[in-house]
Amino acid sequence: MGAGSCGCGILNVSCAAQPSERFFAMKKLQIGLQTFETLITQSFAYVDKTGLLAPLVSQGGRYFLSRPRRFGKSLTCSTLDAIFCGRKELFDGLAISKTDYTWPVRPVVRFDFEQIDHDTPERLEQSLHNTINNMASKAGLVLSTQLLKEKFAELIVKLAEQGGPVAVIIDEYDKAILDHLANKTKADAMRELLRNFYGTLKSKDVDSNLHFVFITGVSKFSKVALFSELNNLNDLTMDGHAATLCGYTQAELELVFDKYIDALATEQNKTKAYMLDELRRWYNGYQFSKQNKKVYNPFSILNCFGKNDFSNYWFTSGTP
């Protein structure tokens, strides 16, 4: 297994090892399902990205990744959660199991803004309070502070005292803002609240208790606008080593979905080679680095195979 370092500080681990035979069969399609454990335990098709995650979780760091909607960001967050929780059995046969990762169990603080109420700034703040309180309760902790930013900090510090350096995973960090772009006053209020909230991660007491931070969303707001208090993020958005972290490569498409490609060819009464060309023409137009590493949109691919037909599935699924 080859390894080398890159300018962004990511250890570049070769992912040449192929998954075990249990991943080759024609499995169920996980349209809309973004929970790693469910995909693995209930025999859904899974495209293995764990070889790309292994160096990130091993060395730790603070990372930011922007990708379009329905591109696998939430599944990536769920996978990271399972890794840090030490769920080694779920990764049997996957690329990370062939690395020297030692599976330390770490406290995980995870926010999914798809699930957090953000109808108003007040409801967003209360929902964040509730989320933090729930995490503290599950860990058997009692938090003494009442202000949101201080409560977030106290949670991280106490979790670290209990179980070592913490992993923070924030999914859809920008959703509370994007959903209110038509109302500038409300969007600005959301942005200010979140700017202060995310700034918690930069404070000295908190930063020293962190192993890993991963923030992902659709947009890439300027540091001045949203991350002015959090300027130590390693931006993976256009980094070549993360170019295929979300989305399916050509090789992954043909490996994991080979039987679905055959079924599509049969349904369309075309050759397999023709179907591969059509899939490429319809869904292979995404590139997230200066390197020529193109990927397919997962949502479109899964819907195409599920319906055995071509359509603009991603475009018609919503905005942004």
Model-derived segments and their meaning:
Residues C6-C8:
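Aromatic, loop-rich ligand-recognition surfaces of beta-strand-rich domains
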